[in-house]
Regions:
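ALDH superfamily catalytic-core signature
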Residues: 230-366, 429
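Short, well-ordered beta-strand elements within core beta-sheets of diverse protein domains
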Residues: 30-36, 51-57, 147, 254-257, ...
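Rossmann-like NAD(P) dinucleotide-binding subdomain of oxidoreductase/dehydrogenase enzymes
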Residues: 123-264, 386
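Conserved C-terminal structural/oligomerization subdomain of aldehyde/semialdehyde dehydrogenase
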Residues: 28-32, 255, 309, 341, ...
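A short hydrophobic/small-residue beta-strand
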Residues: 171-173, 346, 426
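Glycine-rich loop-to-alpha-helix module at the N-terminal edge of alpha/beta enzyme cores
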Residues: 30-118
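Residue-level signal for inorganic ion chemistry
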Residues: 27, 63, 85, 107, ...
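Hydrophobic face of amphipathic alpha-helices that form TPR/SEL1-like repeat modules
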Residues: 1-24
């Protein structure tokens, strides 16, 4: 059985406490790594502080070279990384390869952003006090960054913390999910092969108590967290004076109007609703369909959902595999059962087998049901008809979350209305809310988070403006 060392202060080390990594599909341990102790974390912090000035002074072209190298090697070694990711997360292999390619692209975007780090020369004589003076504005790294990544995209969502930190010149300590730590520890091998200062990056699986130091320790100047709203907002309350960026998920809505291309809407909704068993914070959880086409859309949607192939994530033909663990599968089962007892109807799925929960479609739901009001984070979609576009917008907004929404329409006025009125961080036209490319601003409002990811936007969060006046 392979053991992965953790990456602490620029060195690969073992510790006294092993961490078993379970394959969700087989429910068996397939590899081991180690928990970092509080002493290991202190070593990583100390080393990061020692190299902080070196990172700040590292020329942009050197940062570019490091990021470009990592990007190129991820693409070259895609099979190696995808296998690790699929085994630890239960993600079907074709989606695991897709995530590695996204990570390759995210590092590449970060490399390119190194060439355009902001700065400006400005005249100050707009008021009498500034006569004869000008300013030079530069952006400096904020300092040590703490990154906490989730299990569902264990590589790419970690890269969204690592890559901008390197581009900005910030040392970073990353805590991967203890369910899925191996892909980022494998990534550490590539980071270690670059010319970045040793200690600029540490990747440390930690238990909750040790990991909480990333939140409360004032030596960290920015905390970037991706995870549940409950945990994220507690972290913000405990984070003190450091900057905080939160990406916290949601229960994304999708609107299908009567002018929509139904063929495309059905195909897109199936992917948006059930990719990675719905364990995506922007999965199309609530779908609202114009009443004129509701019956046709529902029938065609269910027909396509029933075609999805369930199976071993290592099989290239598998489209749906297990959830991350049986506890989450049981939670989803309980939420669906509760909805049914309150009047909802299952028109597809509704069955659990161990860590599997079969793709499930519900109708006749009510807004206060958990499957509507909370983040299911599982393979469950609700379908409801709407009478007017304004009603559909109101239903999507009737949520504590506001990450992204999808709108299928060929009416430009409806597109503009949706963009103006939907209370979300992103409006996706003629696609599902699951759409994301890694350089766009990504984040939400309300309980869905604070701040934005997307390399350029993350880099700006990780830098501070300083002005020289003369």
């Amino acid at each position: 059985m392979k053991k992965f060392k953790i990456y602490c202060g620029g060195e690969f080390i073992e510790t006294s406490k092993e961490l078993d990594v379970v394959n969700p599909y087989s429910n068996s341990v397939f590899a081991k790594t180690y928990y970092a102790s509080s002493e290991n974390l202190e070593t990583a912090i100390s080393k990061a502080q020692q190299v902080q000035l070196d990172m700040q002074k590292l020329p942009s072209f050197k940062r570019y070279e490091a990021l470009k190298y990592i990007s190129d090697e991820l693409k070259a070694r895609i099979d190696y990384f995808a296998e690790i990711l699929a085994l630890e997360s239960g993600k079907p292999m074709k989606y695991a390869k897709g995530e590695i390619m996204r990570s390759h692209q995210t590092f590449l975007v970060a490399a390119e952003e190194c060439k355009r780090l902001p700065g400006e020369v400005m005249s100050l004589d707009w008021t009498p006090a500034g006569e004869g003076k000008h300013g030079v504005v530069r952006y400096f790294p904020v300092g040590l960054v703490a990154g906490i990544a989730p299990f569902n995209f264990p590589m790419n969502l970690a890269v969204h913390k690592l890559a901008p930190a390197i581009a900005a010149g910030c040392p970073i300590i990353l805590k991967p999910s203890t369910n899925t730590p191996l892909s980022t520890l494998a990534l550490a091998e590539l980071i270690d092969e670059t010319d970045l200062p040793k200690g600029a990056v540490s990747i440390l699986p930690m238990d909750r108590k040790t990991g909480n130091q990333l939140v409360i320790d004032d030596r960290f100047k920015l905390l970037s967290f991706t995870g549940s709203p409950h945990v994220g907002w507690m972290m913000k309350a405990d984070a003190g004076r450091k900057k905080v960026v939160l990406e916290l998920g949601g229960n994304a809505g999708m609107i299908i109007t009567k002018t929509a291309d139904i063929d495309k809407a059905v195909a897109t909704a199936v992917i948006g609703g059930f990719a990675y068993s719905g364990q995506v914070c922007i999965h199309a959880q609530r779908i609202y369909v114009a009443k004129e086409i509701f019956d046709e859309f529902s029938a065609r949607f269910v027909k396509e959902v029933n075609k999805l192939k369930l199976g071993d994530p290592m099989d290239d033909d598998t489209q749906i595999s297990s959830m991350i663990d049986e506890a989450n599968a049981k939670r989803v089962e309980a939420w669906v059962d509760e909805a049914v007892s309150d009047g909802a109807k299952i028109i597809c799925g509704g069955k659990r087998e161990g860590t599997y929960y079969h793709p499930t479609v519900l109708i006749d739901t009510k807004p206060k049901m958990k499957v509507c009001s909370l983040e299911v984070f599982g393979p469950v979609v609700t379908l409801e008809p709407f009478a007017s576009f304004e009603d559909a917008i109101s239903e999507v907004n009737n949520s504590e979350f506001g990450l992204q929404a999808g709108v299928f329409t060929n009416d430009i006025h409806e597109m503009d209305y949706a963009f103006e009125r939907l209370d979300v961080g992103g409006v996706i036209i003629n696609d599902s809310p699951i759409f994301r490319v890694d350089h766009m601003p990504y984040g939400g409002v309300k309980d869905s988070g604070l701040g934005r990811e997307g390399i350029k936007y993350a880099i700006m969060d990780m830098m501070e403006a300083k002005i020289l006046v003369r």
